Amino acid sequence: ESARLASSSDTGEGHPGGAFQFAALLEALAGMMPAAKPLEMHLVGHSAGAIFHSHFVPELVHRGLSAASLSVLAPAVRNDVFKANVAKFVGKAPGIGALTMCTMTEDAERDDDLVEFLGATVYGKSLLYLVSRAFEPKRKTPILGLEETLRADPVLWPLFNGGGARLELSPARGETPNPHTRALRHGCFDNDAATMRTVATIVTS
């Protein structure tokens, strides 16, 4: 519910939502920047942050604004929402200059015990599996950060598999680590040193 209210253009109570208000603020800021030094934006979202950006990006584009990059970390956004609201703007102006996703491999997602109680595993997969299986109206809803549903998507997989977007997968324990992202739990991407170096390199390049 919090993600929905933050992401929506309208809260449903007659008030503009967070995506609308933030985009309007950036539009005003961009208008104050000198022509020789335009506003440069880099967007980063972890988990539900990708849901926010999937509603924020269209608000930017509607105002003629672009983001130099969008980095999504273990994104919890549905595939259909991301396709409709973000994928079509990658490489476009206005739109998204560079798209990067860091997430876990399918094996690593299955190794991520989300819920443990008194030493016993209560839910033996990652949060993204729980979102896909229990938090969406339809069971097994395709979620962007799940490798298996990404590979099965006829639009998104070509985009991330040589189509202009960058995909960095963190493998399961015991496999060769990826130097660009090493998080082994869903909640660790935003404090994983390798992932943060990757994001910092994108922002400063």
Predicted regions and their residues:
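Short, hydrophobic alpha-helix immediately C-terminal to the catalytic nucleophile
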Residues: S54-P58
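Gly/Ala-rich beta-loop-alpha elbow adjacent to hydrolase catalytic centers
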Residues: L43-G49, H53
